[in-house]
């Protein structure tokens, strides 16, 4: 899997914005990607050094639209902590 396939999009929420002050950045990643692939992708794309990677899996939720029932997509989110002295990603 290539680096551009691993990272889907950055997650910009109030909670993730507060974590940016601690050099923690949040990304939606491919559901098949592991911590090592996420680390390599962030280092390759943004040219920074990664300290640690934490991954959170979200299960699909059951949703209804009238009489039709289905599920939302499952997601995988990665929280990447950069080493001190690295530059800001989104500034």
Swiss-Prot record:
One of its GO terms (molecular function) is structural constituent of ribosome. Coiled coil: none annotated. Pfam families: Ribosomal_L23. Transmembrane segments: none annotated. The gene is rplW. Part of the 50S ribosomal subunit. Contacts protein L29, and trigger factor when it is bound to the ribosome. This is Large ribosomal subunit protein uL23. Belongs to the universal ribosomal protein uL23 family. InterPro entries: Nucleotide-bd_a/b_plait_sf, Ribosomal_uL23-like, Ribosomal_uL23/eL15/eS24_sf. GO terms for cellular component: ribonucleoprotein complex; ribosome. One of the early assembly proteins it binds 23S rRNA. One of the proteins that surrounds the polypeptide exit tunnel on the outside of the ribosome. Forms the main docking site for trigger factor binding to the ribosome. Gene3D superfamilies: 3.30.70.330. Keywords: Ribonucleoprotein, Ribosomal protein, RNA-binding, rRNA-binding. GO terms for biological process: translation. SUPFAM superfamilies: Ribosomal proteins S24e, L23 and L15e.
